[in-house]
UniProtKB/Swiss-Prot annotation:
Gene expressing this chain: Mcts1
The protein, known as: Malignant T-cell-amplified sequence 1
A molecular function GO annotation: translation factor activity, non-nucleic acid binding
Domain of life, per lineage: Eukaryota
Subunit and partners: Interacts (via PUA domain) with DENR; the complex regulates translation reinitiation.
Entry GO terms, CC: cytoplasm
Occurrences of domain PUA (ranges): 93-172
Subcellular location as annotated: Cytoplasm
UniProt-listed GO biological process terms: DNA damage response; formation of translation preinitiation complex; IRES-dependent viral translational initiation; ribosome disassembly; translation reinitiation
Post-translational modification: Phosphorylation is critical for stabilization and promotion of cell proliferation.
Length: 182
């Protein structure tokens, strides 16, 4: 998805309202991807509320309900929760924690290197490669970024160099600044 994928507001190409059958399919996909979301899904996406897909540049689609940006994906890829949603429902993703030193890099969009996950202050929890995770930071209450495991937690510990987690969406990026879409 590359850096700065949500930089310009005018990159929204169109917005479509989804049919009930499509919404059902999306909800099933979300339940499959994020089993922990089940008790909250009807709260996040109430049955009566229209669900829209906002299409952006680079084939990015953002799922919105009542203007709230909930999930996004690229092409037919997996859905990722937005940080705003994650801050309300922090337990829908497994967590990984970086040390204090990694914070400024994560917030500038950098990928997370293995040493930032294995040093004192970091907490590395078991997770397989390709798992979507919430990146927490030492001393911070809320997730800083949504990432994807590029290596398993076990390999991150063993190898301890290179990119451990790809940074997909971080605080203060363009998607964060979109806030809502009416």
């Amino acid at each position: 998805m590359g850096k700065g994928r949500f930089d310009e507001k005018e990159n929204v190409s169109n917005c479509i309202q989804l049919k009930t059958s499509v919404i059902k399919g999306i909800k099933n996909q979300l339940l499959e991807q994020f089993p922990g979301i089940e008790p909250w899904l009807n709260q996040i996406m109430p049955k009566k509320d229209p669900v829209k897909i906002v299409r952006c540049h680079e084939h990015i689609e953002i799922l919105t309900v009542n203007g709230e940006l909930l999930f996004f994906r690229q092409r037919e890829g997996p859905f990722y929760p937005t940080l705003r949603l994650l801050h309300k429902y922090p337990f829908i993703l497994p967590h990984q924690q970086v040390d204090k030193g990694a914070i400024k890099f994560v917030l500038s969009g950098a990928n997370i290197m293995c040493p930032g996950l294995t040093s004192p202050g970091a907490k590395l929890y078991p997770a397989a490669v390709d798992t979507i995770v919430a990146i927490m930071a030492e001393g911070k209450q809320h997730a800083l970024c949504v990432g994807v495991m590029k290596m398993s937690a076990e390999d991150i510990e063993k190898v301890n160099k290179g990119i451990g987690i790809e940074n997909i969406h971080y605080l203060n990026d363009g998607l964060w600044h979109m806030k809502t879409y009416k």
